[in-house]
Every structure is written in C-alpha cells, then in structure tokens.
Amino acid sequence: MKYTSTRGGLIGVDFEGVLFSGFAPDGGLFMPEDIPKVDKRTLQTWSSYSYIQLVKEICSLFISPESIPRADLEGLIDRAFIRFRHRDIVPITRLKSGLNVMEMWHGVTHAFKDLAMSCVGELLDYFLKRKNKHVTILVATSGDTGSSAIESVRRRENMDIIVLLPHGRCTKIQELQMTTVIEDNVHVFSVDGTSDELDYPIKRLFADSDFVKKHNIMSTNSVNWARILVQIAHFFYGYMQCAPLTELTPVEIIVPTGGAGNITAGCIAQAMGLPIHLVAVVNRNDIVHRTVQYGDFSLGDTKATLASAMDIQEPYNMERILWLLAGSEKSHIKEMMKEFQEKKRVKLPEQLHKKIAGAMTSCVVTDENILGTIGRCWEENHYLLCPHSAVAVYYHYQQMDSNDKSPRCCLAPASAAKFQDVIIKANLTPDIPQEIKDLEKKKTRSHHLTKEDDWEKVLRQTIESISQRKVQ
C-alpha cells in the first residue's frame, strides 16, 4: 500500500512516511493510492469480531507487513487500548425509539479522539524506537483533540508535543485536561483565536519543508492519515452491531461533523464496500451542510455553539472526501483547493456535487435543538447526552417522528461529563466521574498568546528550543 497527496505533487509514499507527516509538501493531504475492497464473505466473517479485532484487520489492509509485521501491528494495537474503561471499547447502547448510540468516549479523556490517538502514539513509538529518533508534534484543537494527543505521547522521551487551544472557546474541563498535564515534553499555548485561526500558523510552518525536516516536525491532527485509518473501524463495528447481516441491510450512520475527519473515515468505509449511508450533522458552522446540499464550499464566520468541538468553518478533511469521490477528475482537486485558499469559496463541479450528495446527506442542528434533544433523551431513557452526541440523536428523532424505521447508529463522540454547563442549561444534573472532579485541584501550566503576538514566530522559537534541548 502506497500513498499519494490529494494535490498530486507526491506519489508512492509508504506508511511510515505518511505517519510522520502533517500536510504533504504540496499542501495536500495523504490518501491511499488504492482503496481495498471488502467482499460479502469477509463482511460476514467480520460480523463476529470485536472492535479491536476489526481495528487490526482494517489497519493490516493499509499497512504493509514490510512497514510493520502483522504480529508487531497486533501487539501495538492491543497496547493502545489497555487504558480504556469498557471492555467493548465502543459499546452500543440501545434505547427507546429505536435509538442506537455508539459510546465512543470510554478512553482516558472521555472523547472519541482517544480511539485513533492511542494507536497513533503506539505507531509513532514503534518507529521512533527502531530508529532512535525524536519528533516534535504540532496540534491545534477545538476542544478534545489536544488532550487526547497529549495523553498519547506524555512521558515518551522520543516525542515532544505543542498544543494550541482556543482561549475561552473550550469547556473548562477540556482546557484543564490539557493545562494540568505538567510534563517536560508537553507544551500548551492558550491562544486568542478560533480553532480555524489556530490552523493557519501550523499550515504555514509545514509549508517550510526545510524547517520541518531539520526539526522532525509532524502533526497528529486529523491531517495525519493514521488518525483517519483507525477511525474506519468503528464504522464497520457500528454496521455489524446494527444490521441483520444476513441481508446486508444498509445502515444509516449519523456523524457529528466539525473538521470532517470522522466522516472521511466513513466515506472510505463506504468505498471499501460497507453498505452504509452517512449523515453529516453539523451545528451552525454549516460549511459541510452547504457543500453537500448545494455544492457551495465557502467559508463563513466561526460561530460559538453549545457543541463547541464542532465550531469549525474550515474542515480541511473535506479535501480528502472530494478527492475520494472525484474519480477520474482527481487532477482538478489541486486547482479547486487553490481557488478556495485564495477566495475562501469554491463551487463544486456538478458531477462532483452529485457524488457527494449521493454519498451522504446532511442536517443543521441549533443550540435549541441540542437542549431539546438532551431533555427528550433523558425523559425517555434517563440517559445523558453530550451536546455533540445530541446533534446526532436530534437527526434520529426527526426521522423516527416521520416514521422512517431504517437501522440507524448515532455516533456519540464525547461523555456528557465534559459538558456540565450544557447539561445544567438543559435543566438536568451532570454525572461527573471522580477523575474529572480531581482536575479542579491540580496545578496548571500554559502560555497565553494574544492577537498581537506572532504565533508562527513563537512556534518556531519553541521548536528550536526543543531541538536544542535534545542535542544537549
């Protein structure tokens, strides 16, 4: 299996090369040159597999044994999930009104980012130890990615991590999960900007290929292919749990969508032959919805919502989806993305718009809808939803109320315990685990950056300081 940039400037890259990259040198994102197909017999075999077994099978399709021998791959995947609190990793909770909720938040930080990030940490460690190398990881977060990335690499001598979080735009718990990790290899910056704005200095820095190479810089944001790869597995698992497999019945999988990394994994699962229909459910930051419905891929102002981790107006993983669906027209992606970067808007070609509208539907959910859904789910089931999970469940309730009884799986990306203010706003009482309560008592450490600061310059200085320390 080899990888290519979505903009065509680089082909034939192996898995290790992609793992240790951020954006490709031409500004694109890495994707597999070929998507492996899974036939009906394989699906039936996999139907009895655990989530971890599915991760192993799917990763082995995209990682050649020359890169990582199968036994080594299985061992590192087993290690990745040791700290998860539920033996099923992503259990499906079945509730009234035909509601199936995939709980993706049983990892260390109580968010679905732990699923892929724990594997990425082990994959990085595997290659770095073999080559006695060090990397510096750059991550921008809208809320959950930062803490998950930190947990995946903390105390690892061969990795340092720099995290940019949007000051005042995360929940208090999300911020504490990052700022209370006081380790020599963890560097947290609280920045006066939106999560989209935090991506800009990182993208500019990755464009400086000499600097990136000199300091061994990479990203574990969902620009990193390995994040997308691991996430493919939970679409297969959700399908197996919610469909009567003997009929290969299509299942609708409802995906709360911000940066579009998760739904990119869903599109790849679909391309592999999994009979699913995807629903991209967004908050008022609706660029993905406008793209699906109207072919209008245009930037809007980032709006603060109750589903704060989805407050993203520039979902860079849409480039992967467009490339995947473009078929023989892949060469046009480079020009489309160049136009988007320059004008902050692009109209999709008619054929490409038809393909994306065929692959998924979309829905916009307001804060009022979120609160109403949290309340309804509690009233019917005594089950608390986080605001992002409520975005998915809102769509399910809309379909149920219109008598659509199709098998459906709602992805629940985070625990309600991380969003106490929203639960209280819904006139309910949050249920808070002890480890989250304990965050309030811990010391914190972070560096504040204002609008007046040169963010890219600060990043460069921090990276140079890390490299200098490693030489000493």
Swiss-Prot record:
It holds the Pfam family PALP. Its EC number is 4.2.3.-. Keywords: Lyase, Pyridoxal phosphate. One of its GO terms (biological process) is 2-oxobutyrate biosynthetic process. Its cofactor is pyridoxal 5'-phosphate. GO terms for molecular function: lyase activity; pyridoxal phosphate binding. InterPro entries: Thr_synth_N, Thr_synth_N_sf, Thr_synthase-like, Threonine_Synthase, TrpB-like_PALP, TrpB-like_PALP_sf. The modification N6-(pyridoxal phosphate)lysine is found at residue 113. Acts as a catabolic phospho-lyase on both gamma- and beta-phosphorylated substrates. Degrades O-phospho-threonine (PThr) to alpha-ketobutyrate, ammonia and phosphate. NCBIfam families: thrC. Belongs to the threonine synthase family. This is Threonine synthase-like 2. It comes from Xenopus laevis.
